């Protein structure tokens, strides 16, 4: 991919590839985990995952400058200089929780830190190295994985949109949808877990407004999908969402 590299504390680190048309590929078990990253932290992690390419046997350390990160995120560099410590702290302090299932039921979550290194240095930029414990979820994926171009999530303005977009993608089995689209059923509890909303917005109406509606609006605005949804109810309680998904190309 023609990348430069630098020596940092005796370790070779590679420059970020900045071509956002490249794919972010993750095992569905990683997509379906509990995640609590804020918006820019989530985007930086996905940019780091995009660096993993077919044939990689290891997760490599990377460097990205403040200016390049600002360009990726579409914000002024001054904002990144102001926020970079919060972003790196967020990534380090909020691991992903991988769902372990038995007979279709979640029995526990396994906590895995995203990174072994994520720090800013004024002379080199941001050094980031994904955790080797994530290798089964990022390297040599043959089946049960989700992929999308980085540019699709970089333009999103809500981390809930990123997470629900990934959940929908993980359940779509073909690149081209049938003419009438498809319907995807997701339990409300699973959406809450994936969006770090188990305890936020306890009233469903508030959760719908703040999370589901915001996500669906963003997905419809910036992706190839047209999404609406209906409910699965048990008595008066909404226990699941049926996402109705079709192709919608933006001209």
Indicate where each model-derived feature is located.
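Charged, alpha-helix-forming regions
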Residues: 1-251
């Amino acid at each position: 991919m023609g990348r430069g590299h630098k020596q940092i504390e005796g370790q070779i680190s590679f420059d970020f590839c900045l071509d956002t048309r490249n794919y972010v590929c993750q095992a569905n078990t990683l997509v379906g985990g509990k995640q609590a990253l804020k918006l820019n932290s989530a985007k930086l992690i996905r940019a780091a995952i995009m660096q993993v390419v077919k044939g990689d046997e290891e997760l490599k350390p990377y460097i990205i400058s403040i200016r390049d990160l600002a360009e990726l995120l579409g914000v002024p560099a001054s904002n990144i200089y102001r926020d970079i410590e919060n972003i790196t702290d967020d990534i380090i302090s909020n691991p992903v929780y991988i769902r372990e299932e038995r007979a279709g039921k979640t029995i526990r979550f396994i906590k895995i830190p995203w990174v072994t290194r994520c720090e800013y240095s004024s002379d080199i930029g941001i050094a980031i190295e994904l955790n080797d414990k994530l290798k089964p979820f990022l390297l040599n994926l043959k089946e049960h994985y989700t992929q999308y171009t980085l540019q699709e999530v970089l333009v999103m303005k809500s981390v809930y949109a990123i997470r629900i977009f990934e959940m929908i993608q993980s359940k779509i089995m073909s690149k081209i949808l049938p003419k009438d689209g498809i319907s995807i059923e997701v339990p409300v509890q699973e959406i809450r877990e994936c969006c770090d909303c188990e305890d936020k917005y306890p009233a469903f109406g508030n959760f719908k407004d703040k999370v589901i509606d915001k996500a669906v609006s963003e997905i419809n605005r910036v992706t190839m999908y047209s999404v609406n949804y209906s409910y699965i109810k048990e008595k008066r309680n909404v226990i699941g969402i049926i996402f109705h998904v079709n192709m919608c190309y933006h001209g």
